[in-house]
């Protein structure tokens, strides 16, 4: 059993989603958004760090998964996003969590089956996969999708390494 915290970083709104993985079963534990209403960036980064730290303390995850920075048209926005990611990652590292990063396209491909999926499609599939009664907020849905992707990737990596080990021993199942 593992608890995974997924983070969809943003300098104004950072989504988070927490799930438990037991074998192939995924269970929703919580989600939401850290909203920063202050205007100066250093204060927003402080709020992101504090918010992520609080979530880690509350849910005690085993793994931390976060979306990678994508190339934005606006360089200033990309820099702010990178700084928001940094604040969240530092919170995870300060709590001794292993950090995993996933590209947005990989997350959409894993959860929806299409790397160019729309936000509404991601919300719908997250709702379906986690058996939620309603669509989560967009940023929270993205964070949950990141956590789901981590479960999928880590499960596949475990299966591949077990297959290689069996092959090395002369057994292939």
Curated annotation (Swiss-Prot):
Quick one: which residues bind Mg(2+) 1? 8, 139
What HAMAP family does this protein map onto? RuvC
User: What function is annotated for this protein?
Assistant: The RuvA-RuvB-RuvC complex processes Holliday junction (HJ) DNA during genetic recombination and DNA repair. Endonuclease that resolves HJ intermediates. Cleaves cruciform DNA by making single-stranded nicks across the HJ at symmetrical positions within the homologous arms, yielding a 5'-phosphate and a 3'-hydroxyl group; requires a central core of homology in the junction. The consensus cleavage sequence is 5'-(A/T)TT(C/G)-3'. Cleavage occurs on the 3'-side of the TT dinucleotide at the point of strand exchange.
- The protein's organism comes out as Cronobacter sakazakii (strain ATCC BAA-894)
> Could you provide one GO biological process annotation from this protein's UniProt record?
DNA recombination
Main location per UniProt? Answer: cytoplasm
Family from the record: Belongs to the RuvC family.
Q: What name does the UniProt record give this protein? A: Crossover junction endodeoxyribonuclease RuvC
Q: What keywords are annotated for this sequence in UniProt? A: Cytoplasm, DNA damage, DNA recombination, DNA repair, DNA-binding, Endonuclease, Hydrolase, Magnesium, Metal-binding, Nuclease
